[in-house]
A protein has these predicted regions:
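Short beta-strand to alpha-helix junction loop
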Residues: 80-100, 210-214
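Glycine-rich FAD pyrophosphate-binding loop
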Residues: 12, 24-42
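FAD/FMN-dependent oxidoreductases across multiple families
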Residues: 211-297, 302-326, 333
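Predominantly flavin-linked oxidoreductase catalytic cores and closely associated redox partners
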Residues: 104-231
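C-terminal helical "tail/cap" subdomain of flavin- and related membrane-associated enzymes
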Residues: 293-377, 387, 395
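N-terminal FAD cofactor-binding segment of flavoenzymes
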Residues: 36-72
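Long, charge-rich, low-complexity alpha-helical segments
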Residues: 128, 388-441
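Beta1/beta-strand and adjacent pyrophosphate-binding region of the FAD-binding site
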Residues: 2-15
Length: 441
């Protein structure tokens, strides 16, 4: 059924590649059109990101996350050895993502997409160019995963406008790879040593200050005013040109319709301080294929459920990460500059009506490859609801526990586990989860 439906994914980063693989697993005819990254960049990934890549089929890319770098935090006058992160060259990482796409026999086209997406007989039409020659492609659905610089034009909501200024450096040999983050008067600084005498320094600041910077010398003058010693600027040589890119939080108002959707940074992008964009991208790409499957194969009512489900998930993830960023900015109280004032007051706190948890509700869930409404148990840690613990359906269990005493619930729990042949180890994990989420208690 799905093999006759053509889906075009624009972009082959984490969001685009993992969405394409998910769609291929559902049997769709998938084509990925991408452009190479225009500049060299390094990025830090967590162990959780590595596990996410593996679960979504990006196994070759995950294998680049091998050597971890110690991450030091010098934030708000407090110094910590926070944790470790995998620092990878994004150009090499992107090539591995392409290899993952090839493993699934997904068609890949390196080309520049021209103009906006047109509609022909109610089907999206993409025009792209290779060596000055134009081609067009008709699709049943389009996924825009071209990152925060997507040409997709639409209104978006954004936070204070920050820009990150990135410079590659040649450094003396350092014993082990490392990264650090420092809060300073006019922003914050990320430094990285990635081995083979290669290092990076990145300064994130307000738009007004960033507009005064055209080269590394301009940035260096500002860094000298920050009253901080920077280890990456001891015996260094500048490599290449300074890269300037926006790094503020923004979310498109129109994320999805019945012909196309935005995934990853195309849909919403966050301040690097708020969290890892890769994890945010995978939160979207893990559900996007099932949303598309529903849109292309189900009734209008079911399509609307899927569209609303995706939109609300993206908005929830965005709100969650922006709050995390604000909490970090509020920790710094030494500076009263424009940079810190703006970010310590955004986003404004929402007066949300608190509902009782845990509770049973009917909500959209992914089940059997589609999005449909089903009963779920809403808990403090599962605002969208849960209907499974692993592969165990838990709604009947949750209903009984919420309607009966603790003693009766414990007896029913044992009967439930016995009837479903649940092992003792899994039963204990399920019981601990039910207690933690206040379903049992």
């Amino acid at each position: 059924m799905n093999s006759n439906k053509k889906i075009v994914v624009l972009g082959a980063g984490i969001a685009g590649s993992s969405t394409a693989i998910g769609l291929k697993k559902l049997g769709f005819d998938v084509t990925v059109i991408y452009k190479k990254r225009p500049f060299t960049a390094y990025e830090g990934f967590s162990q959780k990101t590595k596990e996410g890549l593996i679960s979504l089929g990006c196994v070759k890319a995950s294998k680049l996350l091998v050597e971890q770098s110690l991450r030091n935090s010098n934030w708000a006058s407090k110094t910590h050895k926070v944790n470790y992160e995998f620092v990878v060259n994004r150009s090499i990482f992107d090539k591995s993502l392409l290899e993952d796409l090839k493993e699934y026999q997904i068609k890949i086209i390196e080309a520049k997409v021209i103009g906006s997406i047109d509609y022909l007989d109610e089907k999206p039409k993409i025009i792209y160019k290779i060596d000055e020659k134009k081609y067009d492609l008709i699709a049943d659905f389009v996924v825009d995963a071209r990152g925060r610089f997507t040409p997709f034009k639409d209104e978006y909501i954004c936070g204070p406008k920050s820009f990150s200024l990135l410079q590659e450096l040649e450094l003396e040999d350092i014993n082990e790879n490392q990264t650090s983050i420092d809060s300073v008067r006019d922003g914050w600084i990320w430094q990285a040593y990635v081995g083979n005498k290669r290092g990076y320094i990145q300064f994130s600041c307000d738009e007004e200050l960033a507009n005064k910077v055209n080269c590394f010398d301009d940035m260096l003058k500002i860094l000298k005013e920050q009253n901080i010693e920077l280890w990456s600027l001891n015996n260094y040589k500048v490599v290449g040109k300074l890269v300037k890119r926006d790094s503020f939080c923004k979310i498109h108002k129109k994320i999805i319709n019945n012909k196309m959707m935005l995934v990853g940074d195309s849909a919403s992008s966050i301040d690097p301080l708020s969290g890892n964009g890769a994890f945010q991208a995978m939160s979207m790409s893990s559900i996007a294929p099932f949303v598309i499957n529903t849109i292309l194969n189900k009734s209008e009512i079911e399509q609307k459920v899927a569209i609303d489900f995706y939109k609300s998930r993206v908005e929830f993830i965005f709100d969650k990460f922006t709050k995390v960023g604000k909490e970090f900015y509020l920790l710094e109280n030494r500076f009263d500059t424009i940079f810190w004032q703006k970010r310590q007051t955004w986003p404004q706190d929402k007066n949300e009506l608190e509902k009782k948890v845990p509770r049973i509700e009917k909500k959209a869930v992914v089940k059997d490859g589609f999005v449909n409404k089903s009963e779920v148990v809403i808990t403090k840690d599962n605002p969208f609801g849960a209907c499974y613990f692993g592969n165990i359906e838990i709604i009947d269990l949750a209903k009984y526990c919420l309607e009966n005493s603790f003693e009766k619930s414990l007896d029913y729990f044992d009967i439930f586990c016995k009837e479903k042949n649940i092992s003792l180890q899994v039963a204990n994990s399920l019981k601990n989860w039910c207690i933690k989420e206040e379903i049992l208690g």
